[in-house]
Amino acid sequence: MEYVAAYVMFDKVGKELNERSMTELFNEIGAEIEPETMRLFLSKVSGKSMDEVMSKGKELMASLAISSSQKSEPAQPADTAESTQATENKEEEDEDFDIFAAF
């Protein structure tokens, strides 16, 4: 979240956001940087306007809201192995979610 906040701050003041400027900002405020995460974030937003990033974020959030608001069907008696496999598949899908992939 701190990388997103830095992105917004740099955009609002019209400064270029890059690895050096973000590192300087984080050092100035005493925040820790995870270099790999920062580089991944910068690679995903590089060359994109704030409007593009916000629009893509809204689309992503809307799709999450739809999938989480869907009601599940009442439980039906089923083979235990099948229901266990379905639960494991759902958990794997949740683990694979990557917010940076949206950009």
Curated annotation (Swiss-Prot):
Residues 90-103 have a biased composition (Acidic residues). Gene3D superfamilies: 1.10.10.1410. One of its GO terms (biological process) is cytoplasmic translational elongation. Transmembrane segments: none annotated. Residues 64-103 are annotated as: Disordered. Component of the large ribosomal subunit. Belongs to the eukaryotic ribosomal protein P1/P2 family. This is Large ribosomal subunit protein P2. It comes from Encephalitozoon cuniculi (strain GB-M1) (Microsporidian parasite). The lineage of its organism: Eukaryota, Fungi, Fungi incertae sedis, Microsporidia, Unikaryonidae. The gene is RPP2A.
